[in-house]
């Protein structure tokens, strides 16, 4: 009976985890999931657009969910598209997290002016950005370890605002709603050198692949650089111009909310990338899927379940609940192990390279040790400890990502 109960619990947990691995339906009529799988170069490696959107949001607000001013939520990729192509709308999203009350006072704001008391929009910050710059300039010469909480907060907020501002130059010059037509006219494109140079200088996303198939990652260019070089190269730069124009055409479709045109362009561009950069495109698609599956969050939930079951086993049904706690730990550990291995493959890096991966690895090792101890002493103490440690380290890793 005990063995049968254990198998039933294991089957339920595996089915639950399996349900999180199923592809989710695309929200709305725009193929945002398909666009999110397109690779771009950032921070020295190729990443899907989905990763750019999620990591950007994590950096500036500490979470991936975006709340629309009128209610509801906005997908991370949709938020990024608004930053690229509808900045006047993106500026109204409350995505800048500010916790320090003295930093809020710079902008004449209080906790009641922001979403959940700590998130504010660019529109709310814009009138006092000069004062933020002044305060950050005063704080920057101070050694990082010696800065006050206020100084750390203003320096960090300025970095977030600068990151957001640079994102706006990634796909087209901010405010140029006629950019698609302009990129199709060599004379107009050549005349707008200043805007293209601003894109080249400010954008950190290299979104245009090399003209030749394959190509090294360092041959990817940002849109401004690609358009400038294509304009100088003439007919020889046609391939680069075509790929750079994809982002201009995408912008027109997104501003017009023309889903059929948007989806057709995304499908054609992905087909082009798959034909010429197949390995990079497939790996990028896997990373976007990995982001949506989010195995570490599911592991976190399993570790919480393991802790609760272990604690409950000390009050009632020690055998059944203790065994259930161990099974939850087993499944959470296997899922976290798979997540670490896949992450290593996606990033082409060893398991420990920064604070984020250190937290993951420490938690993984600690949970593994607790699993071994629990098998020697079936009293659920190691299961409870493993659940608590696993959950805590994954929370820490989430905030370090």
Model-derived segments and their meaning:
Residues 1-24:
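Hydrophobic alpha-helical transmembrane signal-anchor segments
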Residues 3, 21-292:
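Soluble extramembrane regions of membrane proteins in the secretory/endomembrane system
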Residues 10, 31, 237, 244, ...:
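Amphipathic, alpha-helical segments enriched in basic
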Residues 280-400:
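Core alpha-helical transmembrane segments of integral membrane proteins
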